[in-house]
């Protein structure tokens, strides 16, 4: 293992329980987007707004500069040395829990190395992991070449109007990817 790999492994060991606790906290919000329940600053209803506030609170705790695009998208930045921007995009809204749950879908459980709960995979878990990945830079005093921006959407499951609103009001990132897992399982640590 080289020095960088060792540093990352130590960071993961150090923050892992905080990562899991933050995923658990974010999962606790039943953030099903309902445009009919819109209110100022909460275009997809209060539960989604509350989940967005939770995610932005996690980002602030980790040292990000945060802002809010009128409740459509949360923005968490680690300023870089240049004008370019590398971004991740995740979302804090979920589809309704539906039947088939043997446990409360909004009370995350750890079971035999697995994290179980609505949004753990899609997409609250990846949102938290994305924030902690960027926070590695802050913890180690690394100023990135590009601004690292974590976008936290609120309407991915219904119509993506969050992304359309963002693009109408902000420049496109120079590079964007989603860390959405896309698998039907979420292993705690392998």
Stretch-by-stretch model annotation:
Residues 123-189:
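Acidic/histidine-rich catalytic neighborhood of metal-dependent amide-processing enzymes
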Residues 2-118, 144:
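Acidic/His- and Gly-rich active-site-bordering loop/insert found
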């Amino acid at each position: 293992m080289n020095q960088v790999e060792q540093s990352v492994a130590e960071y993961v060991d150090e923050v892992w329980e905080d990562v899991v606790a933050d995923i658990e906290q974010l999962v606790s919000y039943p953030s099903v987007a309902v445009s009919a329940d819109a209110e100022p600053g909460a275009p997809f209803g209060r539960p989604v707004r509350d989940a967005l506030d939770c995610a932005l609170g996690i980002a602030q705790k980790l040292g990000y500069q945060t802002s809010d695009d009128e409740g459509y998208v949360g923005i968490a930045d680690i300023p870089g040395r240049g004008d370019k921007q590398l971004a991740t995009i995740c979302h804090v809204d979920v589809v309704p829990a539906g039947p088939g749950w043997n446990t409360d879908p909004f009370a995350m459980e750890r079971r035999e190395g697995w994290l179980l709960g609505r949004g753990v995979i899609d997409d609250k878990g990846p949102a938290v992991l994305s924030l902690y990945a960027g926070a590695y830079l802050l913890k180690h005093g690394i100023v990135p070449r590009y601004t690292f921006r974590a976008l936290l959407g609120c309407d991915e499951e219904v119509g993506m109007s969050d992304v359309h609103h963002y693009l109408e009001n902000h420049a496109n990132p120079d590079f964007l990817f989603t860390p959405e897992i896309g698998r039907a399982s979420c292993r705690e640590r392998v």
